[in-house]
Amino acid sequence: MDVLLGAAAVAAYGAIAGYLVLNGAPNVDEGFYGLTARAAVSGLVPYHDFGYTQMPLFPYVHGAVSRLVGFGPVEQRMASGLWALLAVAVGTVFLWRRFGRAVGIGFAALLVTTLNWVYFTHLPKTYAFVGAVILVNIVILEARADFRGRMFWTSLLGVVAVGSRLPVAPFYAVVWLGLLSRDFSAANLLRALGWPAVFTLGLLAPFAAAAPRPFLFWALDFPWQSAALKYWRLDLPALFYFAPAVCLAALALGIAILSGRVRLARTRDVVLLGLLVALACNVLPVGAYEEYATPLLPGLALVLCATLGDLGIGARVVGAFYLVLCLVNLCGIPPIDPTYYADTRKASLYVRQFQRGAFPFVGSASVVALEAGRPVDPRMLMGSFCCTEDYPESQANLLRLMTPAGIAAHMEDPRCEVFVLYNRANWNFVWSMPRFQPISASAVSRWKAILSRDFRLEYGDAHYAVYVRRGVYEGK
């Protein structure tokens, strides 16, 4: 029976994940995550050789997996999904062994039916990997009682997680303080300070040393300056729609804890507090999106399920509870776009046909460069987010950014035979980094003039516009 249940769970997850890999709506970030991963495993260094809006470790992790499966958009989604699968598997096995089949299978069902979580963890972003790291860390904290082991693994995995996605730092700050406060001694303080310092020096310091100014710009200045100009706030109904069952269960657990009906196991209270603090820091500030909760959901689900397991409720009641939660989850539907991958393949065929030689791909639709297997100027790896009018040419080059003049020079180069744009205006070169102010009308007019004079529209669909240089088109 256990084997059959496990096989059914794997089949259900595979069906949902496979559908969303092929039919999930495109995300503007997919191109630059894939290009930076490809660049990192080819020998280029984040910040020193190319711009990158996150901390530096993820391109190497994602690039290593993508090297096995491929760098196309579908392969990128599959590579990211492997980390989501790891999180589901580790959490399920841990809970199954400790609390029984019902709790373990329930955890898997809870995550797999959170369709927005499945969708966003199968985009080539940091969410799936960082979520898996956090979940593994929580499992270690649940399984080990010694301070040394807990702090060592929390320090190592914390540097890996924060070194991939900075906004999860509040979780590790709370857990670090909680672990130290409960087992405080001079020796433990030395360990708590020493291990994070050693891992930070080993994993992150080399990037800062290689390119100090670009490192500070991309890792700290860019998110700070860009966030200052965002004006929207995420409302709580949007968060509940994103992950209905996890949010509802967390609310119920919070009420039970505050009323004194439930007491959390040692260390689990610190973990839950860390997750909630990190969740608040990620979704409450101005300019937040509900997807920022994605890497925290597996850990939150594991804490909820482990607490349910501690209550010792019968398997049938637990199963009924999970069934209700899974039905609630069906209220949150991710964005679907069945034509995205087919259109990307078509656009890439035109790039392969008309772009001769090794001249880099030019255009904002960087995901097409991935599908076509084309090289890209390191200053343009960020795709839609590579252009700046905030800095002069010399400083932009230092920060590995393009200027409008640099893009125009690429367009006017006779070796640039194809130019590809998105058919969504705000996904193109419309924002000046990092302040997200509109690119000047004069720069846009110059680009349009070059496009009209030197190129013709060869292919267009709902997602892309592929322009081919006139002489090249006539020669074909």
Regions from the PLM with identified roles:
Residues P167, L325-G475:
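Extracytoplasmic
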Residues M78-F99, T113, V136:
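Transmembrane-helix motifs of polytopic, lipid-linked glycan transferases
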Residues M151, F171-V198, G254-L264, L302, ...:
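Perimembrane helix-loop-helix junctions
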Residues N27, H122-F129, Y289-E290:
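Short acidic/glycine- and proline-prone juxtamembrane loop motifs at membrane-interface regions
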Residues A108, L135, R150-L166, Y172-G178, ...:
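Membrane-interface alpha helices of multi-pass inner-membrane proteins
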Residues L82, V130, P170-F171, L279-I313:
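Hydrophobic/aromatic-rich transmembrane helices and adjacent perimembrane loops
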Residues V90, L110, F129-D146, F152-G158, ...:
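Specific aromatic-rich, kink-prone transmembrane helix
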Residues A89, F242-R268, L272-L279:
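Hydrophobic, aromatic-rich transmembrane alpha-helices
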